[in-house]
């Protein structure tokens, strides 16, 4: 919700990179299906809030399917339900999770390119998820633990914006469009 408010107020531009490198941690190609659906939604639903809400829904703690031996299969109907819950029309949601996976080649190519970009590597020199950059600078999420803060508060501090300024048009982050994260 915070990112959507920032985006809608023109305080933030968001670049999303959907990746499928976690497929091996599920028994049913979860990453391929969930992000093929996201791409379909992005291409067929004109409201970016719907896509962002869908992504929020699938990353919600009570929806995460686990990994490896803790993985619980998630069928396409459950993914479709999360899309509709996010405001996506039933027709678009049904097509997004029809099983066709028409964006799989694109998703795989994007994945293979993105995970090899050195500017996205963590402090250990490898790609990890989630990865966030601020004005092209890698933002180390481990610093949140060291600072004893949550992701939203840490992010707002890093861009130089107070919580009461979130979603307020004209109130821009103090780092501007080219500054490095503050923390």
Could you tell me what each predicted segment is?
Residues 2-72:
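Structural alpha/beta surface segment adjacent to cysteine/selenocysteine redox centers
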Residues 41, 60-65, 80-87, 138-140:
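A short, hydrophobic secondary-structure junction motif
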Residues 52-55, 80, 93-98:
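Short, well-structured alpha-helical segments
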Residues 72-77, 81:
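Mid-domain, small-residue-enriched loop/turn segments at the edges of structured enzyme/sensor domains
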Residues 84-183:
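C-terminal cap of thioredoxin/glutaredoxin-like
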